């Protein structure tokens, strides 16, 4: 079974393939197709995107939307994570948190899967905190260099993709997706 992953981000494909590697009958293939990103919750964006891409391809497709939510900033950047990363970046988030004791944050991923039977959503959350500074060993992307997951001292960007894939929000969402696929194959 081939499932197309509509994303321009090769890191997401790599992470998905690591998580789903033991499903021998499932092949995830990247398709670089852009779809309109509506303003809404992660769930609304994933559902809309999956339907939109499926209506073009007429083949099983997944889209994924993630957000980075910082408690002390009332959930900002949240659903605007990509835009905020491209504008103020990690430096801007750290600046907004200056003088704040509460550094709790979480990543949330929603995968939208669409086939001839409609859309299904799969969610994953990983809680943690925002580091005091940017910390990276060259791994990861976006907010990974400022996010320390619970029960860790390293940021996601200080972990290899394989290490991050064991605990990430994307892994949790893909594990839910994997359970769904196992029931179908």
Swiss-Prot record:
- Kindly state which reaction or reactions the protein catalyses: XTP + H2O = XMP + diphosphate + H(+); dITP + H2O = dIMP + diphosphate + H(+); ITP + H2O = IMP + diphosphate + H(+)
Q: Where does substrate bind?
A: 7-12, 66, 141-144, 164, 169-170
One of its GO biological process terms is: nucleoside triphosphate catabolic process
Q: Which GO cellular component terms are attached? A: cytoplasm
Entry's EC annotation: 3.6.1.66
Residues the record marks as active site: 65 (proton acceptor)
Q: Oligomeric state and partners?
A: Homodimer.
**Protein name per its UniProtKB record:** dITP/XTP pyrophosphatase
According to its UniProt entry, this protein's organism is Methanocaldococcus jannaschii (strain ATCC 43067 / DSM 2661 / JAL-1 / JCM 10045 / NBRC 100440)
């Amino acid at each position: 079974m081939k499932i197309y992953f509509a994303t321009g981000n090769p890191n997401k494909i790599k992470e998905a393939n690591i998580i789903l590697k033991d499903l021998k009958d499932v092949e995830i293939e990247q398709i670089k197709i852009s779809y309109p990103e509506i303003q809404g919750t992660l769930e609304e964006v994933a559902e809309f995107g999956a339907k939109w891409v499926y209506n073009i391809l007429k083949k099983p497709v997944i889209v994924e939307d993630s957000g980075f939510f910082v408690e002390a900033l009332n959930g900002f950047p949240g659903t605007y994570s990509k835009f905020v990363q491209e504008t103020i970046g990690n430096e801007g988030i750290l600046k907004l948190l200056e003088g704040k004791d509460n550094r709790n944050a979480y990543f949330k991923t929603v995968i939208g899967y669409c086939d001839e039977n409609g859309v299904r959503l799969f969610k994953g959350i990983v809680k943690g905190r925002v580091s005091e500074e940017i910390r990276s060993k060259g791994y990861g992307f976006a907010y990974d260099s400022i996010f320390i997951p619970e029960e860790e001292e390293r940021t996601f960007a200080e972990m290899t993709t394989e290490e991050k894939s064991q605990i990430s929000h994307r892994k949790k969402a893909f594990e839910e997706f994997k359970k769904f696929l196992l029931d179908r194959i």
